[in-house]
């Protein structure tokens, strides 16, 4: 049985332990077979600083890929330096 992504998508609040910065990780459905996972720098109350300019945005073509990417980024972002992580995903 295939899992169906909630129309609103996935959303996680993440506090980076090494830098104490806060981030929001969001995955949304952009089309039938297109999903976007984005990471936004956030304020103390986990409100994204710039909604139009995510720190990292990646597209995937299946729901399982999108969920895996979302949870992997959220988990790694808690314990790794953000700049290094973003550079790794951009290359």
Where are these regions (language model features)?
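Short arginine-rich
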Residues: 71-86
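A short, exposed loop/beta-hairpin motif centered on an aromatic-Gly-Thr core
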Residues: 48-68, 72
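Short intrinsically disordered terminal tails
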Residues: 1, 83-91
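Short N-terminal "domain-start" leader segments
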Residues: 1-39, 43-44
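Short intrinsically disordered, low-complexity segments
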Residues: 41-45, 70, 78
């Amino acid at each position: 049985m295939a899992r169906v992504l909630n129309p609103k998508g996935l959303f996680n609040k993440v506090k980076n332990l090494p830098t104490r910065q806060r981030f929001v990780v969001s995955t949304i459905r952009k089309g039938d077979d297109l999903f976007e996972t984005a990471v936004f720098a956030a304020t103390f109350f986990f409100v994204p600083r710039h909604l139009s300019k995510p720190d990292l945005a990646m597209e995937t073509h299946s729901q399982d890929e999108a969920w895996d990417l979302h949870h992997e980024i959220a988990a790694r972002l808690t314990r790794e330096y953000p700049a290094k992580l973003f550079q790794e995903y951009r290359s």
